[in-house]
Structure formats: C-alpha cells, structure tokens
C-alpha cells in the first residue's frame, strides 16, 4: 500500500437503534448479509486498519474489524464515536462511515480517498441541498479540537465539522442513503 494514501477506516455502530426498536443496525440483514459487511467486504484497498465503535455485540463485530472499541461515554451521539475512533487510529487520517450506509458505500469510500488533499484537516460528503450523512475523513491532528468540542457539550456533527474546518464535497444524494428506518431496506 502507498503509505501516503493509507488511512484508518472507522465505522460508527454505536447508535441506540431507536427507530429499529433498539436493534443493533450493524447486525440487520440486508441483501443477504449484515449491514456492516456492506462497508467492510471487500476490504477497501487503502484501509490500513478497520476500527468499529459499537455499543454492544463486540464479539460479532470482531469478524469485520481489526479492532473493536466502545465509546467512553455511551449514548452521546456520533461525535462520541468519532472521538473514540480518532483516539484509536494509527494512521494520519481517519475515514468515518456509518454502519448503516446502504446508498453507495464503494463510491463514498472512493470519493473520500480521491478528494483528500494534503492540506485538508477534514472533508465530508454532502448532497446538493446541504444534507449530509456521517461520511467524512479527518486528520488525526484534529483530535484535540474534537475532544474540546465534545467535552464542551457539542453533540451535532455539523458543529464538529465547523470546529475542525471541514471542506464539503457534494455528491449524489442517493450515495448517502442509510438504513434509518426498517422501510429503507424493504424490497
């Protein structure tokens, strides 16, 4: 692997699954396999490591990751998971994806790989109307800013993206579709 292009891939799987009746979305079957497999299989070529931040079922997730970790404070939203993943990453940049990304995971990964520029601190994918999913890439040097944001009560990804000076990358809205509701994966 080209060391300059290698990154840590972090998957956010710590949600409460409230709209799924408390189910862990990463374990939900979609197209014959668990949602987490849609991101990790096949393994992205430039992912030097795969990290999964989950709220439960680490024994299951260990089959899809190099390391599995939990948020230090549970049920605090995706910023807690992002901070935990950044703390564990061993490569200079960390790509973050939600476990329930079903739109176009391969295109999302390729775009976050190809759009990254040497002077970026963070980039995130957004649709043409400004809506986003937690599909982003951050330099690990932003960890202190992420921790300060979270420790100061910040819970919204948009606030975190502002704090680290993230650059938006517009993509087709269909790419960012996730399995927010059971109906989103129904035939």
Which residues are covered by each model-predicted region?
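Long, highly charged low-complexity segments
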Residues: 186-187
